[in-house]
Amino acid sequence: MSKILFFMCVIGCFMPATLMAKVEKVTLKGVIKGLGNEELILMNTDQSEIVRTKTKNDRFKITAEVETGDLRYYMLYAPSVGPLGPSMSIPAIYFFIDSPEITIGAELKNERINIKSLKGSPGRQEYDRIMASLPSASRVEEIYDNYNKAFHEYNEVSQTPENMKKLKAASQAVDALQQQRREEIFGLLPQYTNSMPFAVIISSYFGIDNIDEAEKVWKQFDPSIRYCYALKQLEDLIQRGKSCAVGHEAPDFELMTPAGEKIKLSSLRGKYVLVDF
């Protein structure tokens, strides 16, 4: 344990302070066309609230103290437009706060907020550059537009066999595109082992079902950027995956019973327990 702590200390000493996560006062400002005079909430990705404001004629300005430097996502959410739950239309946008001032240009349309421009974020600029460099980039908009149109025609207009056929074809095109983009992104890994924006991109492809692959990718990133939020989350995923492997002791967790009481898995030690996921 002492060797691990010493190694972490050495890494920390040689990292420029400006590159590490820290609490910093920042300003977010901009325009969300079509929002009018509504409440806007700055949130963490776990949906915990940071600060609220109210737009005035589509315009907003927020000053807050947040963690910066590790390229974590933040979210702006307009609660009056719709919920954050699973939906094709969510009135929220995600972005990095990696400089003291971020300027956002966005538009509210069909209960969705779409970013049109974002200034002041080097991380977002590099993220967009990498994604635009993919051979498949020129086809993304067309394929997703076709899918959204087919989805609308079948679910909102008429559930005919012809519309179902179009929806299936559009869905298959999306699946093929996603597979191609995955292969292109993984092929770029050797070039971007020091890139936090690339770490954000590639880490989105991992879940609890491909832990071994996730660990191989995580190990290829330079230790100097492993404080990156995406890589820390990936590391946590790997550790949780290993602890849940067959033959390992199940991690302790707490659930609410139908009677409103809290119960821990560890309190049932020595008993047969069925855990239904």
Identify the role of each PLM range.
Residues 1-30:
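Bacterial Sec-dependent N-terminal signal peptides
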Residues 20-172:
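A non-transmembrane, solvent-exposed segment enriched in polar/low-complexity residues
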Residues 20-23, 242, 276:
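N-terminal targeting or signal-anchor segments and their processing/structural boundaries
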Residues 37, 247-248, 270:
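A glycine-biased structural micro-motif
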Residues 87-90, 103, 176-245:
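N-terminal targeting signals for export/organelle localization
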Residues 201, 253, 275:
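Conserved hydrophobic/aromatic pocket- or pore-lining residues that grip, position, or stack substrates
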Residues 232-266:
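N-terminal "domain-start" segment that seeds a small globular fold
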Residues 264-277:
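Short active-site neighborhood of thiol/selenol oxidoreductases, capturing the structured segment around
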